[in-house]
């Protein structure tokens, strides 16, 4: 058990509120709490009492003692529920520090829960995901991960994989058993089952990352093409100033919305053109930089001279910026102002026709965006995931494919080696084998007090 010292932090958000919670965890948590309250605390009882700094009353509230290992961290934990005034809470923190506690680092309570086997690494990350979820579906999916749905799937997969590894390695170590790799259907069927499960988890992880991290959309195009109007139409409110004057948007304008429960981070940028205006030029530089960070680019145009516009044609539309736009970026061409046309072309491939001002075609555009990122809305089976999970699963998938190749070639030792590599990648998801650097990076992204 992790029992180095005792930590303290405010567990509720900053600012004023009806209640503020202070969390203390560690070997001296009970002793410190009893010094602060001058009470003997019973495990799992709510005790209403004063909180003192020496003999001076700071506040009164409810104190709950959770005796190890039946606590969030697996250590002795005390929660002090006081009035939610930052000055009062900080006075209680100072009193706890005077009694021997130290300030917790970001995510240290959850890190201790992980080190004390109360949570695996995927569940620990889900704690942050559920706190930061920006949609109802994202919150529900994070709850599934926190309950262990993702971890159970990985652990079930590991169980099958380890059994297969043992079987393969036994056949190598004990050749007298005369197992023929090319003919043994047990190995073939087990490997094929593992392959299919990893593929399914791979697809689920992709959905989970979309829900956990959202999609970043960048609106780009020439001035006055209707980018700001499109931002307002997608957001359903007036987020950006819209005028008939080209170059109105001179800086980055951000809006966070949901499309079918999927978080979307939409960024409106300055119109791309050569400008002598220092402020507008800086906005254009920022726009180019943001394009490189996008999951998708919505290239807004009101030019209908070529409805079959392709990426190479952007060189003609904005030649001065063509070389600065990544050639592998996912671009949807949004043809705006169709209300001015007598005949509206049909949507096709990456070309969507809309009128942002009149809200025509916006739903079709939203549907197109979700399809482009591969979101399937199967929220009953989706759990949140991180990019590192996707990387691990993708690597595991590549090596399980190599394992199948080695099986077909009859290379038992290389097959066993590939299975071991797959196991290591899967173990990294739940934290079975994780470096201190990785753990530090993960938990440092948490808020203080969690």
UniProtKB/Swiss-Prot annotation:
Disulfide pairings: none
Cross-referenced HAMAP family: GTPase_MnmE
GO function term, MF aspect, one: GTPase activity
Source organism of the structure: Francisella tularensis subsp. tularensis (strain SCHU S4 / Schu 4)
Gene Ontology process terms (BP): tRNA methylation; tRNA wobble uridine modification
Residues that coordinate or bind GTP: 224-229, 243-249, 268-271
Protein name: tRNA modification GTPase MnmE
Annotated positions binding Mg(2+): 228, 249
Binding site for K(+): 224, 243, 245, 248
Lineage: Bacteria, Pseudomonadati, Pseudomonadota, Gammaproteobacteria, Thiotrichales
UniProt-annotated binding residues for (6S)-5-formyl-5,6,7,8-tetrahydrofolate: 23, 79, 118, 450
């Amino acid at each position: 058990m992790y029992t180095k010292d005792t930590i303290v932090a405010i567990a509720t958000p900053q600012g004023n509120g009806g209640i503020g919670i202070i969390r203390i965890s560690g070997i001296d948590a009970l002793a410190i709490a009893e010094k602060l309250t001058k009470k003997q605390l019973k495990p799992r009882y709510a005790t209403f009492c004063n909180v003192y700094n020496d003999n001076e009353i700071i506040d009164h509230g409810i104190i709950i003692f959770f005796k190890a290992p039946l606590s969030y961290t697996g250590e002795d934990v005390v929660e002090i529920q006081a009035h939610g005034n930052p000055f009062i809470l900080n006075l209680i923190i100072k009193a706890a520090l005077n009694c021997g506690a130290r300030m917790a680092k970001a995510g240290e309570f959850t890190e201790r829960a992980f080190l004390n086997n109360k949570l695996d690494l995927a569940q620990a990350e889900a704690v942050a995901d559920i706190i930061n979820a920006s949609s109802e579906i994202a919150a529900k999916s994070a709850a599934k991960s926190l309950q262990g749905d993702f971890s159970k799937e990985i652990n079930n997969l590991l169980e099958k994989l380890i059994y297969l590894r043992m079987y393969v390695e036994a056949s190598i170590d004990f050749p007298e058993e005369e197992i023929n790799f090319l003919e043994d259907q047990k190995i073939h069927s087990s490997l094929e089952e593992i392959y299919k499960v990893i593929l399914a988890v791979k697809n689920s992880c992709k959905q989970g990352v979309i829900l956990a991290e959202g999609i970043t959309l960048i609106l780009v195009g020439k001035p006055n093409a209707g980018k700001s109007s499109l931002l307002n139409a997608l957001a359903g409110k007036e987020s950006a100033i819209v005028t008939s004057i080209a170059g109105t948007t001179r800086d980055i304008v951000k809006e966070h919305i949901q499309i079918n429960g999927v978080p979307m981070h939409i960024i409106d940028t300055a119109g791309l053109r050569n400008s002598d205006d220092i402020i507008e030029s800086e906005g254009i530089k920022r726009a180019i930089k943001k394009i490189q960070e996008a999951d998708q680019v919505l290239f807004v145009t009101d030019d209908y001279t070529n409805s079959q516009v392709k990426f190479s044609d952007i060189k003609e539309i904005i030649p001065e910026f063509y070389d600065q736009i990544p050639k592998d970026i996912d671009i949807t061409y949004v043809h705006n102002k169709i209300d001015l046309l007598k005949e509206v072309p049909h949507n096709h491939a990456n070309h969507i026709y809309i009128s942002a001002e009149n809200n025509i075609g916006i739903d079709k555009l939203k549907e197109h965006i979700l399809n482009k990122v591969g979101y399937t809305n199967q929220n009953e089976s989706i759990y949140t995931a991180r990019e590192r999970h996707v990387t691990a699963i993708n690597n595991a998938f590549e090596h399980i494919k190599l394992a199948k190749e080695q099986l077909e070639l009859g290379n038992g030792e290389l097959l066993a080696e590939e299975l071991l590599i797959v196991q290591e990648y899967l173990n990294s998801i739940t934290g079975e084998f994780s470096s201190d650097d990785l753990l530090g990076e993960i938990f440092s992204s948490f808020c203080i007090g969690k």
